């Protein structure tokens, strides 16, 4: 009997220790999720706008249930409100969303090669973050990848915090690069219409967050575009941006990456759903100039071309094709998308839609 008591006590202590350990692991995990999904937005280097708490998500197939999407988007196509060209109704008026608000910025750096890249949602941000993590710590990245066979999300989160800067000044101070001499500063840009459609199908159709997603419009694109335009306009007027998971995917590209002050320093790389074409050529041109060995470029090429269809890719789905056609065939909806993203077209040198 005397021998059993110590064993029982030892077992109880073991169970308690394990419970405490698992509790700490879960707390760490939830902290990680919160940090990963809730970014703050700065209108200056010090003042952060409040963040929206993480919500439950509902998933919807992009390949089935097309009858539901068609039923929710059966409203009559309306004519344009404003006539003339976009330049005529956007310049020096309040019809279009003003440029250069200071939305969240995330620079990923590879200091060994003096490379900094500003990531933007719906412009290959997940894949690019993984590549810059590889360039930041190649040995650890490859070792962990071999052990875990990491997904795109694993690769994106592996270095987060270690090679990420929210402000360009912090990056410059860390690496003594006030003038960014010898550094490459890059950003992937995307056609505003293509980016909007991708964001809409991904955030409002494929996965909807919270009890009233996408401005309470459910899956009706007309409702969402008109209400999102009004949201943009009010926030731009107040100079205070809200921080929702949806907003990060729709805010104009020119609100990111210190474009107002650093545009001339950037090397802009155009997004392509087929990364083996122009995008890879532009990226590799920069990489070779910065001294990245061919062996590492082979790894990057593999990352850009294999399994390019990440979990949030919407290309080629019936839902994507339906909403793209719906937008392009609606004069009113196209007008309001142009009003929201006019300055992206101009600043990033993309052609405006026909008729604008």
UniProtKB/Swiss-Prot annotation:
Family per UniProt? To C.elegans C41C4.1 and C18B2.1.
Protein name as catalogued: Uncharacterized protein C18B2.2
Compartmental location: Membrane
Write down any Gene Ontology CC term.
Answer: membrane
Disulphide bridges: none
One GO molecular function term?
chondroitin 4-sulfotransferase activity
Q: Which topology term describes how it sits in the membrane? A: Single-pass membrane protein
Transmembrane region(s):
8-28
Tell me the organism. Caenorhabditis elegans
Source organism, top-level taxon: Eukaryota
**Alphabetical GO biological process terms:** positive regulation of response to oxidative stress
Cite the entry's keywords alphabetically.
Membrane, Transmembrane, Transmembrane helix
Q: Name one Pfam family in it.
A: Sulfotransfer_2
Q: What is its main location?
A: membrane
């Amino acid at each position: 009997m005397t021998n059993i008591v110590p064993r029982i006590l030892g077992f109880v202590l073991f169970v308690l220790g394990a419970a405490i350990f698992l509790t700490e692991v879960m707390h760490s995990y939830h902290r990680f999720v919160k940090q990963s999904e809730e970014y703050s937005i700065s209108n200056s280097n010090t003042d952060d706008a409040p963040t929206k708490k993480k919500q439950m998500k509902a998933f919807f197939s992009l390949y089935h249930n097309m009858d539901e999407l068609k039923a929710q988007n059966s409203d009559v196509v309306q004519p344009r409100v404003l006539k003339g060209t976009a330049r005529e109704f956007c310049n020096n008026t309040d019809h279009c969303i003003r440029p250069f608000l200071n939305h969240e910025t995330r620079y990923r750096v590879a200091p060994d090669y003096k490379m900094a890249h500003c990531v933007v949602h719906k412009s290959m941000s997940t894949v690019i973050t993984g590549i810059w993590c590889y360039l930041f710590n190649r040995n650890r990245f490859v070792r962990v990848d071999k052990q875990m066979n990491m997904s795109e999300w694993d690769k994106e989160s592996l270095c987060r915090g270690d090679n990420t800067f929210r402000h360009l000044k912090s990056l410059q101070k860390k690496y003594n690069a006030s003038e960014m001499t010898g550094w490459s500063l890059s950003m992937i840009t995307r056609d505003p219409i293509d980016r909007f459609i991708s964001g809409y199908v991904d955030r409002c159709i494929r996965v909807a967050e919270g009890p009233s997603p996408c401005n309470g419009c459910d899956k009706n694109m007309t409702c969402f575009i008109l209400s999102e335009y009004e949201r943009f306009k009010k926030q731009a007027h107040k100079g205070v941006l809200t921080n929702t998971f949806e907003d990060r995917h729709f805010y104009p590209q020119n609100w990111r990456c210190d474009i107002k002050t650093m545009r001339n320093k950037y090397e802009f790389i155009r997004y392509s759903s087929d990364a083996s074409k122009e995008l890879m050529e532009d990226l590799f041109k920069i990489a070779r100039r910065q001294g990245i060995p061919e062996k590492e470029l082979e790894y990057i090429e593999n990352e850009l071309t294999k399994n390019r269809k990440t979990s949030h890719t919407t290309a080629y789905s019936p839902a994507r094709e339906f909403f793209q056609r719906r937008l392009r065939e609606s004069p009113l909806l196209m007008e309001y998308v142009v009003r929201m993203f006019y300055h992206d077209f101009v600043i990033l040198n993309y052609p405006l839609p026909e008729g604008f």
